[in-house]
Amino acid sequence: MPAKLSVNLNAIAMLRNRRDLPWPSVTGLGRTALQAGASGLTVHPRPDQRHIRFSDLQPIRDLIDDEFPAAEFNMEGFPNEAFLELVERHEPEQVTLVPDDPAQATSDHGWDFRKSHNLLGNVVGRLKKRGFRVSLFADGIPDPEALKLAKETGADRIELYTGPYGGCYDDPEKAERIAIELGRTAEIAIGLGLAVNAGHDLTVANLPLLVEHIPELAEVSIGHGLTADALEYGMAETVRRFRRACGETA
C-alpha cells in the first residue's frame, strides 16, 4: 500500500502571517489538498505562533470532521503541558512528539531515546489513555537499542527525520547511502512492531527512492517542498504529483 500523504500547513500559515490579513487561507488550502486526495493535514503549533496559530486548530479540526471524515489531523510538537492541552482540546488522530527547543526554526533532529525515555513514557501513556495514535520523531540511524527504547514508551510509530536525505538533492550517491540507512532503520522499527512515517525536506524528486528503500512506509508529512511546488503548479496538482511520487495512482 502506498504511503499516505499528510500536507503540513505551516509554510502556508507563515506566508499568511507576513500581513495582518486572513490569506492565504490555511483551511482553504487545506480543503483543496484534501479534495485532491491528501490523506490528512499536519500542523506544528509553536509557542510563539510564528506560523500556525492556536486559533487555526479548531477550524482545521472542524474542516476534517465536517467535510473529510476519512482524513486525519496530525499535530506535532514538543510535549510540554501547553502543547498537550492543545492536543487534548482538538483531538487529532495522530500526535507526533518532537524534541524541539521553542526557538528552533524547524525540527532538525530526532529524540535521544536513552536520555528522554522516562519523559516520553509518561507522555505517551497520557496520550494513549485518551486514544491518540502517537509517533516519535527519530533520527534515521539504524540503532536497534534506541528503537527498542522507543517501542518501550508505548508509541505506535516513529517518524524518520529525513532532513539529511533531503539535503542531498545535488549528490545522488550520498542520497542513496542515506536512503539505505533509512531503510535499515525502518526495517528494525517495523520488526519491533512500530509503524514508520517520514518527514522533512521531501520532494517529488526524492520520494521515489525513499519509498523504494522503505516499501512499508506508512505516511509522509510534507510542507516546505509541497508549498514551494504549489506556487508553481497550484495546490491540487501539487498534491496529485506528490501522491504519484508516493506510489499512488492520482
From Swiss-Prot:
UniProt GO cellular component terms: cytosol
A GO MF label: pyridoxine 5'-phosphate synthase activity
Alphabetical UniProt keywords: Cytoplasm, Pyridoxine biosynthesis, Transferase
Keyword Membrane included in the entry's annotation: no
EC number per UniProt: 2.6.99.2
Amino-acid positions noted as binding 1-deoxy-D-xylulose 5-phosphate in the UniProt annotation, renumbered to this chain: R46, H51, T106
Residues where 3-amino-2-oxopropyl phosphate binds: N8, R19, D201, G223, H224
Protein name in the entry: Pyridoxine 5'-phosphate synthase
Organism: Rhizobium meliloti (strain 1021) (Ensifer meliloti)
Gene: pdxJ
